A protein has these predicted regions:
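Compositionally biased intrinsically disordered regions enriched in Thr/Gly
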Residues: 1-79
Length: 79
């Protein structure tokens, strides 16, 4: 499903972010991002769709609201 593809894409994005900034997401973020995913938590920009999570859903409060830009030209089913 498209939700599964988006969640996999977000998981890869988080893994990349953790390389640069370890500890900015909870250790069990793969499970949390699936449990806390709400398809209505998004907004559109000229560049693409921004999917966001609430504070403390997948990361410490100090990390703020995690946002993930999914560019319009991205093919998440290949992630």
């Amino acid at each position: 499903s498209y939700i599964h593809d988006i969640q996999n894409w977000i998981q890869l994005e988080i893994a990349e972010r953790l390389k640069a900034n370890p500890g900015t997401y909870f250790d069990n973020y793969p499970q949390l991002l699936r449990n806390s995913f709400h398809p209505e938590n998004f907004y559109m920009t000229p560049e693409g769709i921004v999917i966001y999570y609430q504070q403390y859903d997948i990361a410490p409060y100090s990390s703020g609201i995690p946002e993930f830009l999914l560019p319009f030209d991205a093919n998440v089913s290949e992630s």
